[in-house]
């Protein structure tokens, strides 16, 4: 499925659309920003769109809402990890983005990295941390600096760049307060990149790469969403051959995970020009600071046109006719 600048989508053909926003995760605030942007875009195109907050409203209310499809603008736990996707499968309501398994896999950084490694895709070396881990040994094995973060959070929440072995325990405890699974990975010194992908299977394609230049190379939660100090370069300014390699790696990583609809791969480009995959976001941000709309604009696709195409592609792991129905 190719995304185009001016899609011919009849808003009435989309039916009643629910925009799931807010939720219960640590990224609730960002989800509200994304969801409200998506809701406004759909309504501006004449779509019968309604916001729905699973953090405040019940499953029974969702089932009774009568949505013909939903746009998942939830981020993090319960919205990006296969949970809401499984519920929507049960309800038979088509939804945007990846299915249950791909969402769950992509949310778990350990599972994602192990799968990528199995397919020979470059990702930083890592180790799982526990309270009784020999932190000095991990630091010696992975090398310093290294990154410690929760295995199942996004938006850099709970992340620490460790520059000395004696910082490891504090970094672990910070991440462990958010997730039982904590990961340490080798720090890749180089350019921070992100690359959106749209479509499914062989039709999946990458949008332009964005190069991120953050203050003091610190692209944290604050710099991602609440300051204007971070520079986003699109076109990326990379050598064209390097850009092609990054885009190809992003698409390959998306296909390996079984993603569909849309997602965003985050990468690092080492000083020698080798790209490394960091993680896959299956429900990317759609705020005023978000990167997917920026990449879309670079190829002439407006925010509204992009949203319309994402929601038009809403589907289920199973075709609706394959869902069990009582006699």
From Swiss-Prot:
Transmembrane domains' residue ranges: none
Q: What class of enzyme is it?
A: ligase
Record keywords: ATP-binding, Cell shape, Cell wall biogenesis/degradation, Cytoplasm, Ligase, Magnesium, Manganese, Metal-binding, Nucleotide-binding, Peptidoglycan synthesis
Which pathway is this protein assigned to?
Answer: Cell wall biogenesis; peptidoglycan biosynthesis
What EC number(s) are associated with this protein in UniProt? Answer: 6.3.2.4
Cofactor annotation = Mg(2+); Mn(2+)
Which BP terms in the Gene Ontology apply to this protein?
Answer: cell wall organization; peptidoglycan biosynthetic process; regulation of cell shape
A GO cellular component term found in this entry reads: cytosol
Pfam families xrefs: Dala_Dala_lig_C (PF07478), Dala_Dala_lig_N (PF01820)
Q: Where is Mg(2+) 2 annotated to bind?
A: 279, 281
Enumerate the residues binding ATP: 139-194
The main location is cytoplasm
> What PANTHER family is this protein classified in?
D-ALANINE--D-ALANINE LIGASE, D-ALANINE--D-ALANINE LIGASE B
**Job of this protein:** Cell wall formation.
Mind telling me which HAMAP family this protein's record contains? Dala_Dala_lig
* Name assigned to this protein: D-alanine--D-alanine ligase
Source taxonomy: Bacteria, Pseudomonadati, Pseudomonadota, Betaproteobacteria, Burkholderiales
